[in-house]
Structures are given as C-alpha cells and as structure tokens.
C-alpha cells in the first residue's frame, strides 16, 4: 500500500481536573520504525471528548499539510467503538438529517460541536482516501504508545508538540 499513511489516535481524561491529553502517531507504509508523535492537552468534560479531540487533531493535521498528495491514503486506528461506528456505519447522516437531534427530536446534548467537526473533516478527504480501523484498546502496540503519551502529557507542563 504505497502512499499510505498509518495514523493511531488516543485520548486520556482526568475526571478531577476536567482535562484531557491527546496523542496521535503516524508513519508511512514501509517506515514503521520512523514514528512521528503529535500531542497536546486541553479542557474536556468527558472521556469520549478526549477521544474525539485526538481524532480531530489528527485529521486537521493531515488536512493542513502543505504539499499533500492527492493519491495519499490514510488509515486511522482508533479504539473508541462509538466513534468508529458513527463514521463507518454513517450514523452521522441521521443526525445531519435531523438537525443534529436524535430521531425522536430530542437534542444531542454532548459534544455536538466536536461530532460535527469530526464529520466535516472526514468529508473533506476525497472518497476512498480515508479509512478507519478499529483497534483493541491497549492491546494494539501503536494504541498503547499513543495512550501512554496522552496520559503522560496530562502530568507535564508541555505545549502541543510534534516529536520525530
């Protein structure tokens, strides 16, 4: 799979502080030993929010890369099943049709802005160039690495950073 970039994301959340750490790593096909980590922290109100932020940061990063090639494919490994299904099963279409309310008309209460941002970014990638892959939390080696960095960043006074 030449011209494929593999991305793994994870978020970590501290209930007491209402903060999250996020991390994503990436590497090019065939260059698994050349990992790049991108991480940061921000305020959050729930664990799912930290996972959403990690994926959004990754998508924003690759959408904004200068000189991005049209024929590049992206595979994103995520461990959050709800987010995986929301995109791959196209659950978001129902929310778009219903004005981001549930089918019974009740408003979606949590993280609506983040869910919408995720969908907007997902749609910015040409069809067939972005694939989500469900990975097992803390069992996939790249997920373990992003989890460790996301948890580590919560306890440090570091700014968002790219580490190669």
Each PLM stretch: what is its role?
Residues 1-49, 60-63, 148-164:
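RNase H-like nuclease fold core
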Residues 14-16, 56-147:
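RNase H catalytic domain
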């Amino acid at each position: 799979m030449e011209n494929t970039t593999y991305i793994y994301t994870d978020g970590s959340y501290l209930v007491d502080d209402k903060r999250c750490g996020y991390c994503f790593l990436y590497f090019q096909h065939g260059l698994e030993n050349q990992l790049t980590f991108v991480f940061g922290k921000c305020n959050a109100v729930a664990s799912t929010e930290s996972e959403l932020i990690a994926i959004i940061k990754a998508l924003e990063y690759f959408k904004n890369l200068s000189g991005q090639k049209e024929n590049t494919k992206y595979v994103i490994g995520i461990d959050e099943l709800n987010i995986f299904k929301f995109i791959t099963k196209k659950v978001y279409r129902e929310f778009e049709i219903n004005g981001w309310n549930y089918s019974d008309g009740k408003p979606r209460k949590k993280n609506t802005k983040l869910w919408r941002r995720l969908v907007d970014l997902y749609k910015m990638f040409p069809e067939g160039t972005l694939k989500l892959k469900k990975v097992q939390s803390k069992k996939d080696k790249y997920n373990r690495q992003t989890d460790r960095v996301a948890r580590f960043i919560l306890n440090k006074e570091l700014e968002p950073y790219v580490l190669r």
